Regions:
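C-terminal accessory module of base-excision DNA glycosylases/AP lyases that mediates lesion recognition
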Residues: 1-36, 98, 113-222
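Structure-specific DNA junction-binding interface
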Residues: 1-73, 77-91, 221
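Hydrophobic (often cysteine-bearing) scaffold residues that line and stabilize catalytic clefts
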Residues: 42, 46, 59, 97, ...
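Alpha-helix N-cap and coil->helix boundary residues
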Residues: 61-65, 79, 96, 143, ...
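Alpha-helical ds-nucleic-acid-binding substructure associated with the helix-hairpin-helix region
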Residues: 67-138
Length: 222
């Protein structure tokens, strides 16, 4: 019997009810992500990587707007660090994030004869792809790498452990405490616990992420 079997209280039932209410919308959003992997351009995939580089300590809507503005103006693909930083008003660590974007662009988009899609396609495993991104792209940690791989439709089984998700995992007794920071070992340990909970309540990992995010924010964003 699952260790979550006796935890069928109002909180868990509320998660299940919310999932049934939002399931169709969640599936639609995930289908959009799959379309990105199947038909998106290399530039569109890079834009998703930039979005995920921007997300730490920043609102998703602001990150999306910044990427849209920089794409429209061409700064994202041609601008220097200072020009990109000017577009990140409202975010934290704008100079550092701008530098990460330029380095990723020069390494992945401009300086690599093999596309990011080809690299990930050869890896063909979500966990290994995440490790590759963490090792090779500055500004990308385990959360951001999982977020990126989900958003481009490459993998839907990785945990995206931001503060909203961690807060709810504690409420659901999946974890005992809210960690101030996460080492690689801690991240992977919590991911396994979230996967166990996902199986116990019969909500796929990628769907569960959206449900817990919606519970906190009232939105289903990317």
């Amino acid at each position: 019997m699952s260790r979550f079997a006796i935890k069928q209280d109002r909180v868990i039932q509320g998660i299940k009810d919310l999932y049934e209410h939002k399931r169709a919308e969640i599936c639609s959003r995930l289908d959009e992500f799959k379309e990105m992997w199947q038909a998106g351009t290399e530039e569109q995939i890079f834009c998703e990587l930039v979005f995920c580089i921007l997300t730490p300590m920043a609102r998703g809507a602001m990150c999306s707007k910044a990427v849209e503005n920089m794409t429209r103006s061409g700064i994202l693909f041609k601008g220097n660090c200072a020009e990109i930083a000017k577009e990140l008003t409202g975010a934290r660590f704008i100079n550092k994030k701008a530098a990460y974007i330029v380095e990723a662009r020069d390494k992945i988009l401009h300086g690599n004869p093999v596309s990011l899609r080809s690299i990930l396609g050869k890896i063909n495993d979500g966990y290994q792809a995440r490790e590759w991104l963490v090792r090779h792209v500055k500004g990308i940690g385990y959360k951001e790498a999982g977020h990126f791989l989900r958003n481009i439709g490459f993998n839907q089984d990785l945990a995206i452990l931001d503060r909203h998700i961690l807060k709810n995992l504690k409420k659901l007794a999946v974890i005992d405490s809210f960690p101030d920071s996460l080492s690689r070992r801690q991240y992977l340990t919590i991911e396994v616990k979230m996967q166990e909970f996902s199986e116990a309540v019969h909500i796929p990992m990628s769907h569960l992420d959206f449900v817990l995010w919606y519970k906190e924010t009232g939105e289903i964003l990317k």
